[in-house]
Amino acid sequence: MSKVILKIKRLPHAQDLPLPSYATPHSSGLDLRAAIEKPLKIKPFERVLIPTGLILEIPEGYEGQVRPRSGLAWKKGLTVLNAPGTIDADYRGEVKVILVNLGNEEVVIERGERIAQLVIAPVQRVEVVEVEEVSQTQRGEGGFGSTGTK
């Protein structure tokens, strides 16, 4: 397996923050940090856009997936609103994370706090072909819980 290189440009408001890193040897996601000037209060059911201070150069054929951190979701009720957020390989703007507080208490995010995970994943592009009919399956049109919960 060849090594995939992720090039990162750190913006001025993130110069003192660590670069994204894996927390353990087998972590799938790189931790993204809040590049905010001062603590940010997030009220219950409020959403905020948090800068990371990073611009990524994701290799062609890959995407960045911004995912919630399980600890923030469990302990504080915070999650990534559009999870997984997609960062396309040709995007060159600052990476920002949309967080929402689904809890009943106000949450404070501190500068440098780990707020999300970034997973770099391969992308498979497809050719779109319009047809008159699609093949039948045993499942058919069943969806939205049609297979039960047990």
Swiss-Prot record:
Pfam families: dUTPase. InterPro entries: dUTPase, dUTPase-like, dUTPase-like_sf, dUTPase_trimeric. Its EC number is 3.6.1.23. It comes from the Bacteria. Keywords: Hydrolase, Magnesium, Metal-binding, Nucleotide metabolism. It catalyses: dUTP + H2O = dUMP + diphosphate + H(+). It is an enzyme of class 3 (hydrolase). GO terms for biological process: dUMP biosynthetic process; dUTP catabolic process. Its cofactor is Mg(2+). One of its GO terms (molecular function) is dUTP diphosphatase activity. Substrate binds at R69, S70, G71, N82, T86, I87, D88, K96. Pathway: Pyrimidine metabolism; dUMP biosynthesis; dUMP from dCTP (dUTP route): step 2/2. This enzyme is involved in nucleotide metabolism: it produces dUMP, the immediate precursor of thymidine nucleotides and it decreases the intracellular concentration of dUTP so that uracil cannot be incorporated into DNA. Belongs to the dUTPase family. This is Deoxyuridine 5'-triphosphate nucleotidohydrolase. It comes from Aquifex aeolicus (strain VF5). The lineage of its organism: Bacteria, Pseudomonadati, Aquificota, Aquificia, Aquificales.
